[in-house]
Amino acid sequence: GNWLAQLKGEQQAQALALLRRSETLPWIIEIACANGVNVIAHANYPSSHYVRDKPVNKQSVLWDRARLRELMSGNEAGIAGADHFWFGHTPLKTRYDCQNLHYIDTGAVFGGALTLAQLQ
């Protein structure tokens, strides 16, 4: 965004280095807890069955809201392969849980509440 273009010299170089480094971070995180296997992704897991390290469309992981729209229109289908799936990206008034899917973005970036979930 504009914030990066407005940085100068060493600050911009450092920001660019951190951005490049962030490209090596995982797109999907799996955590085994007492409550089972928890999968965390930004917006969606683009499959009806989770498999660790399964190749998936990264753009869908980051941006896709189709599953949430389907859930909210009454098509309640969870994802097989793990006990819980945690998503953000789409600000909602309150946390939304359906089947084994949990949407916890409550718009903190826009002045809404910050929702946290303790997995263990």
Predicted features along the sequence, with ranges:
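Acidic, His/Gly-enriched loop-helix segments that form or flank divalent-metal centers
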Residues: G1-Y103, G107-A113, L119-Q120
